[in-house]
Structure formats: C-alpha cells, structure tokens
Amino acid sequence: MGIVEGITEWLPISSTGHMILLEQIIKFNASEEFMSMFRVVIQLGAIMAVVVLFWGKLWPFGMKQSRVISKPSVWSLWFKVVAATIPVLIISPLDDWMEAHFYNYITVAAMLILYGALFFVVENRRAAPHVSRLEQITYRDAIIIGLWQCLAIIPGTSRSGATIVGGLLLGLSRACVAEFTFYLAIPVMAGASLLKVVKFVVGGSVMTGTEVAVLAVGCVVAFGMSLAAIRFLMDYVKRHDFKFFGAYRIVLGIIVLAVAAVTAIF
C-alpha cells in the first residue's frame, strides 16, 4: 500500500481507485478502524517527499551577508496555499460521512471515468497558458483551485486530478499547476492525518506493535515512491499533456466496474 500511495497520490489517477482494488486483491488482516486510519496517515510519508524536494522554495528564510532574511515571495506563496486550504477546512467535517456512504466501487469508478473524460475536454479546448510561474498565481486563482480541491472529498476523484483540472481551466501552465498542487497537499494531508489519528485514539482504538511497524514501513515506502513520482510528473508535464492520465483513469474506472460486477456475482 505504501508503493501504491507513493505513486498514485501525486499522479492525477486517484489513490482511492487503486486502494479499493488493492484491498480486494489482498485481504488485510487488520481492523476496519486501523485500515481507515492507515489509508490516510500513510500520506505523511508522501508529504515529506514534497518538503524534501522543494525545501528551497518552501522555506521562507535565507541568509545574506551572515544575516537571516525573510523571503517575501515564499511568504506570499504560503498565504495563497492557506487561502486555497480554507474551503477544504470548511467541508472537512463531511469527510467521514462521505467515506461511509460513497467509498464503493460504483462511486470510485464513476469519478475515475468522469475526470478522465474531463482531462480530454480541458486539454482539447485549452488555450495558451497565461500563468507560468507560481508568483503569478493570484489569491482568486488559489481560492478557486481550493474549491476544486474540495471535490476530492468524493472517493475516486483524486485531489491532484481535481486541482490540476481547475488550474488548467484558470490558465495555469501544466508545470505550474502541478507544483502548486504539491504544495496544497502539505496542510491538507497533514491535517487529515492528524485528524484520523485523533479519531482513532478517541474512539478507544489502540495500535498493536505490529500495526505500528506496518504504519511506519508504509510511510517510509510512500516517501521513497513519492520522490520518484513527483520527479517523474514534473519532467513529464514539460513535454506532454494530461491526456495519457485521462485515458488511464477511464480504463481503470472500467476495471473497477468489472471487479464490482464479478464481486456482486460471486
């Protein structure tokens, strides 16, 4: 699961779509409470990959003539990330309800196919981008992308898929929207992980030594795979559009529907 999380969290192909298939193929000997928490907390490893790769762009302080200086451009970026995160905070109380009612094959497959088709529509109608650098992103852009990010509360949507579609519609370049999407993940995924742990503990659950080890290994593996996935995507979007990912999502959605049909029959 660490491998799947590390790769699919950053590519716009839905980590949930892959997780739901993986859980069908591999029967995990763990409680549903632990698996629900594990699926989210494992993202901490993925977040660390973003921090490591983009540390120079994310750290708002530097040195000049032996003095610590503040970087206004980095502070501005962080304020925009915070602005984009506010819509997610508002709808976050719905997260558990959405998971309980829509974490199923049909919903996941529908979202995979829908956003796969959206990638084709957006790329085919796309004009030349007018935002190619992070500092050109306005607060309006950030908030709208944040609203698109809210759609990821529906299983199978893909957080990165939703924000990338939103960013492309706003006129951001592929590389710019991909990088901004990585940064948006830091507060959202860190907050979601913390919330899941708190709910797990408050609910009276206690991790066994084996579960702690499994979670730690999952985070480490997710970190390593995320490093590779992020580097791949940033290099890929410099030369290609997102149609490949759209096609992949549609095919995966059909596979999920097929698995759902077989599961219902047998």
Q: Model-predicted segments: where are they?
A:
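Multi-pass membrane proteins that catalyze or facilitate reactions on polyprenyl-/lipid-phosphate substrates
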Residues: M1-F266
